[in-house]
């Protein structure tokens, strides 16, 4: 692992919507990697490919996002320090000191290092260098609603066999559900092999959890392959106390390499299924009436319930459905839920 190159990347400012410097830096880096072809689209997303496939092969694809939430400053000073061994969200479980990276401004004040998701970017670049056949995607403006990945070049995905995103904190997280999208089937060869590889690479038992939103959920809607999001070594994200565990980044790189060794250049299909959030009182009706392969989760809230939008928007019974929320969810008053349920049910029957 080239620590100097990692620190160089971390020093490039990349606040959301101000990512030009980072994109230029990445294109310069890609120019120097032998055997790699790349391009950027009109959104400034960057796509890179290495190696030529044989008949029946598919590329593994690794992705991350180029933006951070931190205020853009002229110069980010990255320093190596030692902290107690971190666990997710900065909690410690022993007194062992480990090497970490932290960021400061030129006045010596702590600032966000942007490990979310510069760790992911660095890991993707390292895998591009070390693997023979691979694709990577680096997407802009994830932090404000996955704007880059939602408008990605779908043609780039057509020969991809599975997708891995590096955009979870710590060293023991795997995202199964993201933005109302299930990324993989737990009862599958893909997950069985991936879980074993990631667990061995990090040396931790992995926690399979839900992630609020990130780019892989947008790609999953566009391609019917298994996807996953995993930890990549940043802690205390979105704060000036953010730091990066160097060892965890190394483990994440090894996890990616080992995934490709074990999974190979195969396609691991998994059909996109929306997850519908409904009041518990009508959740059973959804399951019984639809008899479809749709995941249904229910929960109660005092004022509002949450339902995922299903691509088509219309007016019916005085209810206007729109994609006003960037994360793909609507907030619907209780009194509208009964008639809304009929609309959703009708759509799902047509769609599936």
Regions found by a protein language model. Give the residues of each.
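A non-catalytic alpha/beta surface segment that caps or lines the substrate-entry region
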Residues: 5-8, 12-56
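Positively charged, low-complexity terminal tracts
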Residues: 287-352
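Short glycine/proline-enriched coil/turn segments at helix->beta-strand junctions
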Residues: 2, 31-35, 42, 55-59, ...
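His/Asp/Glu-rich mid-to-C-terminal helical/loop segments that flank catalytic regions of hydrolases
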Residues: 236-292
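Acidic/histidine-rich catalytic neighborhood of metal-dependent amide-processing enzymes
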Residues: 109-186, 208, 216
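An extended, acidic, His-containing surface patch that forms the Zn2+-binding/catalytic region
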Residues: 178-223, 272-275, 296
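Active-site metal-coordination/substrate-binding segment of hydrolases
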Residues: 57-133, 143
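Zn-dependent metallopeptidase/amidohydrolase metal-coordination segment
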Residues: 207-252
